[in-house]
A protein has these predicted regions:
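Small-residue-enriched hydrophobic alpha-helices in membranes
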Residues: 1-225
Length: 225
């Protein structure tokens, strides 16, 4: 049976955690409606029901480090969810990487695996349309394997973090679709499982989170299915 202990973070830690995710979402200058809806649902329904989304602000690396405390597992778990927020749409931009790097330094962490993720950075000056995280050539091996292993190390011990993962990662791979304007196709969006080579990894984390909520917390997980 699962022996995972349930450890809840304090409200101050969760507030700082959420503000950190907001900071990542704002990093590239585009706070999409999908990101707004996700953060709002996490705030109102899952993490801090009494907190108004509009009252939340971005957070500096120094303040984040102070609020999260000294526990290395807590700090690294936060950083994992911050990376998940950054790569959820299949694109890892330089502004997002900068925020993640600043958070990592302030938290006193040195995650070697993140260097492999930086090799996938999208450079808008070279491409008008994000092409997503690019898997390596076969001859290079899987350069993203280190970050996959690192993401897999997240501790799912707080139900609010587990709910975050379940909300963050869709239950099914989003279908490919065409974006049209005045009846003319302007861009084709491939399915997320092809766009983002880390998508399968995120799905695995989602399954672990569902299992934690159902088995350890005895929660009804049907809303996430």
């Amino acid at each position: 049976m699962n022996n995972t202990k349930t450890i809840k973070y304090t409200d101050r830690q969760i507030t700082a955690w959420l503000r950190g995710l907001l900071t990542v979402a704002y990093a590239d200058g585009h706070f999409d409606p999908e990101e707004q809806e996700l953060i709002a649902s996490l705030t109102q329904d899952e993490l801090l029901p009494c907190t108004d989304l509009g009252s939340l602000e971005t957070i500096s690396p120094t303040e984040l480090a102070q609020e999260l405390g000294d526990d290395s597992h807590t700090k690294e778990n936060f950083l994992r969810t911050a990376v998940m927020m950054a790569i959820a749409n299949g694109v890892y931009s330089q502004p997002e990487a900068n925020v993640v790097h600043d958070f990592q330094e302030a938290l006193g962490l040195n995650v070697e695996a993140l260097k492999s993720l930086e090799s996938t950075l999208w450079h808008p000056e070279k491409s008008e349309i994000p092409e997503g995280l690019k898997p390596p050539e076969e001859s290079q091996g899987d350069v993203l394997q280190p970050v996959k292993n690192w993401l897999d190390g997240i501790d799912i011990k707080d139900p609010r973090v587990a709910r975050f993962v379940c909300k963050m990662v869709p239950s099914q791979c989003p279908f490919e679709r065409d974006i049209t304007l005045f009846g003319r196709k302007i861009v084709h969006i491939p399915p997320m499982c092809k766009l983002n080579p880390l998508y399968e990894q995120l799905v695995g984390l989602r399954f672990r989170s569902l299992s934690f909520l159902a088995d350890d917390c005895q929660e009804d997980v049907s809303p996430y299915l």
